[in-house]
């Protein structure tokens, strides 16, 4: 006898499994939205109009309305298929055959001709040699003998400066490290010798100096430097305060006062601290 629970399992086995949905590139990255046209308008849309309708009316951003549930249409039309985005280089428009076949040489553009300036120095020199002095004679001479300054004459070819035969171009290479001098402490020995020579020169310079004898002070030199002492006057006090004693005397005698000061100094350490109970270091 078949189990009554098996028919339910058999029915579920006949159900087809859902295949995974593969999206195309156009679905993942849809093409850019183009501006609306009259053909795209259907009944019930927001941009449906009555009367004469032209495509240019749907390219005006002030007139076009946003459709329900869709992004707003832009009225900017895209260029055609043959349009290249970016910089177009005309020198490389032939591709690989043109690059391999010949060199791309740009022709020099012809310079625009300009009027040459007059050479007044040469014309004045010629007029003086011809004996012309007045302004009218000079003007007529310049009309007959119009001398111009050539641009090629101003461009003097400067010769390069003479280069010495032992000239080295570029950065000179670092000389090789003298390992033998480093191992022998040659630089240390040279430094010690220089220090000794410097000390010897200082000693010789001190010996060459004339050592003067001790100068003794005489009575005349002492009188020359003597300054008489200035007697300072005592400070002035008011006469009726001279013999006034202290107003308050708490000690009967001076001995008692000194004894109290001594006891105060002995108790000075005990009366220190935040609570005036002394400073002590507890173990």
Swiss-Prot record:
InterPro entries: CFAP77. The keyword Cytoplasm applies. It holds the Pfam family CFAP77. One of its GO terms (cellular component) is axonemal B tubule inner sheath. This is Cilia- and flagella-associated protein 77. It is found in: Cytoplasm, Cytoskeleton, Cilium axoneme; Cytoplasm, Cytoskeleton, Flagellum axoneme. Microtubule inner protein component of sperm flagellar doublet microtubules. Its main location: cytoplasm. Belongs to the CFAP77 family. It comes from Mus musculus (Mouse). Keywords: Cell projection, Cilium, Cytoplasm, Cytoskeleton, Flagellum. Residues 151-170 are annotated as: Disordered. Microtubule inner protein (MIP) part of the dynein-decorated doublet microtubules (DMTs) in cilia axoneme, which is required for motile cilia beating. GO terms for biological process: flagellated sperm motility.
């Amino acid at each position: 006898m078949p189990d009554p629970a098996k028919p339910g399992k058999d029915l579920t086995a006949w159900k087809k499994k859902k295949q995974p949905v593969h999206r195309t590139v156009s679905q993942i990255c849809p093409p850019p939205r183009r501006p609306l046209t009259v053909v795209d308008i259907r009944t019930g849309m927001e941009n449906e109009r009555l009367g004469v309708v032209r495509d240019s009316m749907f390219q005006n951003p002030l007139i076009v309305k946003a459709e329900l549930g869709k992004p707003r249409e832009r009225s900017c039309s895209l260029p055609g298929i043959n349009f290249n985005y970016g910089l177009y280089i005309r020198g490389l428009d032939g591709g690989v055959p043109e690059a391999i076949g010949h060199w791309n040489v740009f022709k020099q553009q012809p310079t625009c001709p300009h009027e040459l300036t007059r050479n007044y120095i040469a014309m004045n020199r010629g007029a003086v040699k011809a004996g012309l002095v007045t302004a009218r004679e000079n003007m007529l001479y310049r009309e007959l003998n119009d001398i111009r300054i050539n641009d090629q004459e101003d461009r003097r070819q400067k010769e390069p400066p003479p280069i010495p035969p032992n000239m080295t171009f570029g950065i000179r290479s670092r000389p090789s490290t003298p390992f033998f001098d480093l191992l022998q402490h040659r630089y240390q020995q040279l430094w010690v010798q220089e220090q000794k020579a410097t000390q010897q020169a200082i000693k010789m310079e001190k010996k060459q100096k004339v050592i003067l004898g001790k100068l003794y002070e005489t009575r005349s030199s002492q009188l020359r430097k003597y300054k008489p002492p200035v007697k300072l006057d005592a400070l002035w006090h008011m006469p009726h305060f001279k013999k006034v004693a202290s107003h308050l005397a708490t000690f009967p005698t001076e001995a008692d006062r000194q004894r109290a000061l001594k006891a105060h100094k002995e108790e000075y350490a005990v009366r220190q601290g935040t609570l005036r109970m002394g400073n002590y270091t507890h173990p």
